[in-house]
C-alpha cells in the first residue's frame, strides 16, 4: 500500500482478507491525508451471487466487473441448451441431482479433504467458546462440526461481512436460511448446535459479558473461511 500511495499508479489486488472493509477504509484514509480532494478510483474483485449487491457503505467505486460480465456473457448463451446438456450428463453419469445438491456435496468433499485442517481449527474454537457458557457447554464437538460444515456447504455466496454493524439485511437473511437448510439436511444433528451458530453469527442474543471479543474473532475467521470453501467447492470441484 505504501508503494501504491507513493507511485500513484501501481495497482494491487487483495484477496481473502479477514476484514476487507477495514482495509478499504484505511486505504482511502491514507489517500485523504495528503490529497483529500483527489480520492483514488478503487474497485474490488467481488463475485456477486444472484440477489446479492455490493454494500453501499464500502468506500469503493464498484467491482472489477464480474457482475457485468455475467450479464454480457448471457448474450452468447442459448438457455435452451442447458436442458439438453443436463439430460446428456444424467444419461452419461446416472446422476440426477440438481446443481445445488452437487455444490453441497462438492463443498463437503473439499472440507473433508484439502481444507480439513481449517475446519478442525474452527470447530475447536467454537467448542471452547461454547464451553465458556453454561447454556451451550453441553453441545458436542461432533454436533458443532456437522453444523458448521453443513452451514458452510449450504451458504450460496462466497462470504458475509457480519460484525461491527457491517452486515446487510440480505446477509442476515441468507445466514438464517442457510442454517435452516443445513439443519434440514442433517436431522440427526443436535439442533442446539445450529442455534449456537445462529446466535454467534447474528449476535442474537448478545454475548455474555467478557465473551464478545472472542466471539467477534471467531465470526471474522469463519466468514473468511467460507470464501475459500465456496471457491474450491464451486469453481474447482
What are these regions (language model features)?
Residues 1-9, 15-237:
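Alpha-amylase-like alpha-glycosidases and glucanotransferases acting on alpha-linked glucans and related
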Amino acid at each position: 500500500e505504501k508503494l501504491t500511495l507513493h507511485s500513484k499508479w501501481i495497482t494491487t489486488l487483495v484477496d481473502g482478507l479477514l476484514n476487507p472493509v477495514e482495509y478499504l477504509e484505511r486505504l482511502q484514509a491514507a489517500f485523504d491525508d495528503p490529497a483529500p480532494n483527489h480520492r483514488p478510483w478503487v474497485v474490488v474483485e467481488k463475485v456477486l451471487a444472484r440477489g446479492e449487491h455490493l454494500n453501499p457503505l464500502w468506500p469503493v467505486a464498484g467491482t472489477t466487473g464480474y457482475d457485468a460480465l455475467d450479464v454480457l456473457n448471457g448474450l452468447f448463451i442459448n438457455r435452451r441448451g442447458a436442458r439438453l446438456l443436463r439430460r446428456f450428463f444424467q444419461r452419461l453419469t446416472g446422476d440426477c441431482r440438481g446443481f445445488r445438491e452437487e455444490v453441497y456435496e462438492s463443498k463437503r468433499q473439499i472440507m473433508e479433504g484439502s481444507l480439513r485442517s481449517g475446519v478442525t481449527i474452527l470447530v475447536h474454537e467454537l467448542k471452547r467458546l461454547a464451553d465458556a457458557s453454561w447454556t451451550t457447554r453441553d453441545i458436542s464437538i461432533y454436533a458443532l462440526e456437522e453444523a458448521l460444515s453443513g452451514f458452510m456447504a449450504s451458504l450460496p455466496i462466497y462470504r458475509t461481512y457480519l460484525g461491527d454493524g457491517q452486515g446487510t439485511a440480505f446477509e442476515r437473511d441468507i445466514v438464517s436460511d442457510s442454517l435452516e437448510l443445513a439443519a434440514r439436511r442433517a436431522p440427526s444433528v443436535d439442533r442446539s448446535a445450529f442455534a449456537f451458530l445462529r446466535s454467534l453469527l447474528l449476535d442474537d442474543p448478545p454475548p455474555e459479558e467478557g465473551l464478545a471479543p472472542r466471539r467477534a474473532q471467531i465470526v471474522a475467521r469463519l466468514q473468511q473461511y467460507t470464501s475459500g470453501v465456496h471457491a474450491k467447492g464451486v469453481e474447482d470441484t
